[in-house]
Every structure is written in C-alpha cells, then in structure tokens.
A protein has these predicted regions:
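Core SAM-dependent methyltransferase catalytic element
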Residues: 129-146
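A short glycine-rich, Lys/Arg-flanked "PGG" loop and its adjoining helix->strand segment in the class I
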Residues: 68-80
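Class I SAM-dependent methyltransferase SAM/SAH-binding core
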Residues: 1-43
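Acceptor-substrate binding/catalytic loop of class I
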Residues: 96-113
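A conserved beta-strand element that flanks and buttresses the S-adenosyl-L-methionine
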Residues: 54-55
Length: 146
C-alpha cells in the first residue's frame, strides 16, 4: 500500500494485484480511483501493458520455480522501456521467518540467475543493490524493458 500511495502522489495510475480479498478491499477503500484486482500474481493476465511493474515485498514469498515463471508474467505486461522493480533476498536460499507471530516463507534465486532471467525476458538491468540500507536492507532490482 505505501508503494501505491507514493505512485498515486506522483500523479500516476495504479493497477494493484493481490490474492487477498481483504487486502484488496483495504486498497479500494484507501485509493478508490485506482484499479484493484484479486488474483494470484503467478497466473495474472491483463489485456494491457504497463509503464511500470513493481513486485515489492511480494515476489520473494514465491518458491524458486514460481519466481522463474513470474518473468513470463512480467514480460507479458511490459513494453519498450517499462520499468520493472522488485526485491529479493541477497542470495540463493529458502527460509521461514516470522511476521507478527505468523510464519512467513521467503525464497531467492542466485543473483546470476536473476540476471539471466532479466536478459532472457528482454529486460536491461539498470541497478542492483544488495541489502540496500535505503530500502530497509532489501535487495533491489531495477530493470527496463528493451
């Protein structure tokens, strides 16, 4: 939600996707003029492409195979110069963390594999920052569609 608020504050439109109906309901309440869709991002298909695609604090909750498959989803919704921004873990692995007392799954691929997926799906890497302190310690990927 904070990412969407920031985008809207800068005069842009948001199409938000989440598998949680209650989270989408909250988004519709707080930002009613935007498009909110209840869907699993792994199977998301929209009739149009976007100027920007952001998978922030969501993508790394997918398993390694689903993360690989998501690049097809990203590419299907990108066009020339679409910006793709996502965050991952710093290295290959899987872990179960804790958020407010609930277990939370995290997974990441190896940095070289992410680089390969970006290239394979025609994204040019602009910036990669591992455990970026300005992003709360997140590992950030910023790319552009070619």
């Amino acid at each position: 939600m904070p990412v969407a608020c920031n985008v809207v504050t800068h005069g842009m439109r948001v199409t938000g996707v989440d598998s949680s109906p209650s989270l989408i309901a909250l988004c519709r309440e707080r930002l009613p003029d935007q498009e909110w869709i209840v869907a699993d991002m792994r199977g998301f298909r929209h009739a149009r492409t976007f100027d920007g695609i952001v998978a922030w604090d969501s993508y790394f909750h997918l398993g390694p195979d689903d993360q690989r498959s998501m690049f097809e989803v990203f590419a299907a919704h990108a066009r020339h110069h679409t910006i793709l921004m996502l965050n991952t873990g710093p290295a290959f692995g899987e872990a179960v963390g804790n958020y407010r007392g609930d277990p939370v799954y995290h997974a990441s691929l190896d940095s070289n594999e992410y680089r390969g997926l970006l290239a394979r799906y025609d994204f040019e890497l602009i910036e990669h920052s591992i455990e970026d302190p300005q992003a709360g310690g997140r590992t950030v990927w910023l790319a552009r569609g070619r």
